[in-house]
Amino acid sequence: MSENSANELKYSRVLLKVSGEALMGDKGFGWDIETIDNLSHDLKEVHDLGVQLCLVVGGGNIFRGASASAPFGFERASNDYIGMLATMMNALSLQNSLEKINVQSRVLSAVSITAVCETYIRRRAIRHLEKGRIVICAAGVGNPFFTTDTAAALRGIEMGCNVIFKGTQVDGVYSADPKKVADAVRYDKISYRELLSLDLKIMDVAAVSLARDHSIPIIVFNLGKRGALADIICGGGLYTTIYN
């Protein structure tokens, strides 16, 4: 980033979707502390620029409700509630990692767990942002059958974010999985309509439709690359923009 990066910010309030898988590093389950701490340092870099930062965390590193129904024999709704609790565990892990480097944050849950964190209230969340705290949203939208991607779109819209960042393991949207298809084409930009028509499964249809209907762009980037988020916010970096 340049010395004048603070004056070159493209966005002032952003929503970052962090998948549960992004927190487990090379492990097959749970957390990788080094990975979480690296993410926290990247978040601090953005926070120190003066950007208001809201996170929505997934829970797939612990439990994935949509795919657990068959092997466990549980109802899908029950599975989704278990998944919401998994997102709470991830949110608290991130909060503790941020506190280690003196970054104030608040966990707000769509499901009331008052002994652990605050219940999500839109105005309260916005006030935390205005006070310079990172807001970490847990428990999705608080209802089963909705993904945390949909929660990210919803929170981004209702909290007035300029953009939704979708952190992945690659540096944008490709025509196919670049880890499996050597000649997969990477898009610098792609419209919501084209994304849906090509059935590129970056986010679920409900999330993409929400963002499209409210004209909020989605930026897909490599969350695992150190400093990538700050680079993009300051006008650089490698990513794909999904737009109307």
From Swiss-Prot:
GO terms for biological process: 'de novo' CTP biosynthetic process; UDP biosynthetic process. InterPro entries: AceGlu_kinase-like_sf, Asp/Glu/Uridylate_kinase, Uridylate_kinase, Uridylate_kinase_bac. Keywords: Allosteric enzyme, ATP-binding, Cytoplasm, Kinase, Nucleotide-binding, Pyrimidine biosynthesis, Transferase. GO terms for cellular component: cytosol. SUPFAM superfamilies: Carbamate kinase-like (SSF53633). UMP binds at residues 59, 80, 141-148. Pfam families: AA_kinase. It comes from the Bacteria. It catalyses: UMP + ATP = UDP + ADP. ATP binds at residues 17-20, 60, 64, 168-169, 174, 177. One of its GO terms (molecular function) is UMP kinase activity. It is found in: Cytoplasm. Allosterically activated by GTP. Inhibited by UTP. Its EC number is 2.7.4.22. It is an enzyme of class 2 (transferase). Residues 25-30 are annotated as: Involved in allosteric activation by GTP. Pathway: Pyrimidine metabolism; CTP biosynthesis via de novo pathway; UDP from UMP (UMPK route): step 1/1. Belongs to the UMP kinase family. NCBIfam families: pyrH_bact. Catalyzes the reversible phosphorylation of UMP to UDP. Homohexamer. This is Uridylate kinase. It comes from Ehrlichia ruminantium (strain Gardel). The lineage of its organism: Bacteria, Pseudomonadati, Pseudomonadota, Alphaproteobacteria, Rickettsiales. The gene is pyrH.
